[in-house]
């Protein structure tokens, strides 16, 4: 894909006049011409490269991750739910989620691998097994295991190297990338390049799919900059809203994924 190179800056103004020397009584006339210094051009591509390097440096590098999360969920049908969940991950391998309903009763257990999504509905005693494409069906986003893990951990998603616009103002850097699925407007804190927002618009103008991801309440643990609050809104035919509040979390500690299907569960 052809890159569009944008240049932001001022054109250097060069003003100079060649002084005319006149010799009168062996006295040289002083050159009174004012020379305006050249204004340095801003290399936008260099600024983009610097920002992307810092974004890459801020990526959380982990082997395992576990967290307790308060989740507020509003589905496309307008119903709202609030649950507490335990999330465990092994990078590039699996995601395990246990969601509790009222009174701390476990309502759902989920296991996501590279090729499948398995769900245990413990309230209704139903077991569901689907292919990984099920993630896209329920979220309207092109999700696989790796992308979902990046979203949970707080790393940038759908960020393409094809940066078509760069902005900087009010302490916020904006990088607009054009990828296969989305135009992604990534908003960064100017100082440390932490992610503030990622606004996604479908790259296909025939589709009306948008998503907005907000990151806030950053903490530093074991050298990793982690956003403890997230807001995700996805709109297509309906609107899906998810808020995540990470209460406790840890990196690179042993994790287990207990997942067994009782014999009396209905298979779906």
Each language-model region and where it sits:
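An acidic-aromatic
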Residues: 22, 94-145
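Positively charged n-region of N-terminal signal peptides that target proteins for export
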Residues: 1-4
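N-terminal leader/targeting segments and the immediate start of mature chains
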Residues: 18-70, 76-80, 266-268
């Amino acid at each position: 894909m052809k890159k569009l190179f944008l240049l932001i800056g001022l054109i250097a103004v060069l003003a100079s006049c060649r002084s005319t020397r006149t010799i009168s009584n062996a006295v040289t006339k002083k050159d009174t011409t004012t020379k305006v210094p050249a204004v340095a051009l801003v290399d936008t591509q260099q600024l983009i490269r610097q920002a992307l390097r810092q974004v890459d440096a801020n990526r959380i590098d982990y082997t395992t991750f576990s967290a307790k999360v308060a989740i507020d969920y509003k589905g496309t049908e307008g119903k709202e739910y609030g649950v507490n969940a335990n999330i465990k991950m092994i990078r590039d391998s699996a995601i395990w989620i246990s969601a509790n309903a009222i009174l701390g009763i476990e309502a759902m257990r989920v296991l996501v691998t590279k090729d499948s999504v398995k769900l245990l509905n413990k309230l209704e005693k139903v077991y569901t097994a689907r292919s990984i494409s099920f993630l896209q069906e329920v979220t309207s986003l092109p999700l696989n295991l790796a992308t979902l893990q990046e979203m949970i951990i707080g790393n940038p998603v759908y960020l393409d190297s094809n940066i078509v616009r760069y902005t900087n103002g009010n302490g916020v850097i904006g990088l607009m990338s054009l990828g296969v699925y989305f135009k992604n407007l990534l908003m960064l804190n100017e100082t440390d390049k932490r992610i503030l927002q990622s606004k996604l618009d479908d790259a296909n103008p025939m589709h009306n799919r948008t998503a907005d991801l907000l990151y806030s309440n950053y903490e530093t643990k074991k050298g990793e900059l982690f956003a403890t609050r997230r807001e995700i809104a996805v709109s297509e035919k309906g609107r899906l809203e998810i808020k995540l509040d990470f209460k406790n979390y840890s990196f690179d500690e042993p994790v287990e994924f207990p997942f067994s299907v009782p014999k009396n569960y209905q298979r779906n």
